[in-house]
Amino acid sequence: MLSLAACHQAASNLPGDSTDHQPWRGIARDEVVHFLGTEPFWGGEASGNELTYTTPENQDGETITVSRFAGRGGLSFSGNLAGGAMTLAVTPGECSDGMSDRTYPFTVTLQIGPDVRQGCAWTDHQGYRDATQKE
């Protein structure tokens, strides 16, 4: 019984509204999520149960089957890439790729095995802004 109480107490420290039990709806299930990162360069898109991961060395990319999960504060796609576990987490928040004047509406964290990368994302309905565009 003590371990259950301890687990419950730790769960109260989770971010967000603890009474909100609805999955995040910031990206519709039918939207295509485009993502990119630099240092090293990588990118791709996720749609439905498929994710295509691209690099300069593999511009056609590798397409894998993924599971989509909408949590309380974002969206994730999980599958196996290059023989290892892969998760792409998408969360709302302004993002800059550091190489262009674009501002993206989502940040992404890509983990392939032990390798973790940060990047940006957008959808066809929620695009990026160039510095010359007004909000």
Q: Could you tell me what each predicted segment is?
A:
Residues 1, 89, 114-115:
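Processing junctions and N-termini across compartments
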Residues 3-6:
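C-terminal motif of bacterial Sec signal peptides marking the signal peptidase cleavage site
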Residues 8-10:
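Bacterial signal peptide processing site
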Residues 15-38:
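Post-signal peptide N-terminal segment of mature Sec-exported envelope proteins
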Residues 30-89, 124:
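Central antiparallel beta-sheet cores of small beta-barrel/beta-sandwich binding domains
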Residues 85-103:
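Acidic, glycine-rich flexible loop segments
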Residues 102-135:
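C-terminal partner/receptor-binding element of secreted or periplasmic proteins
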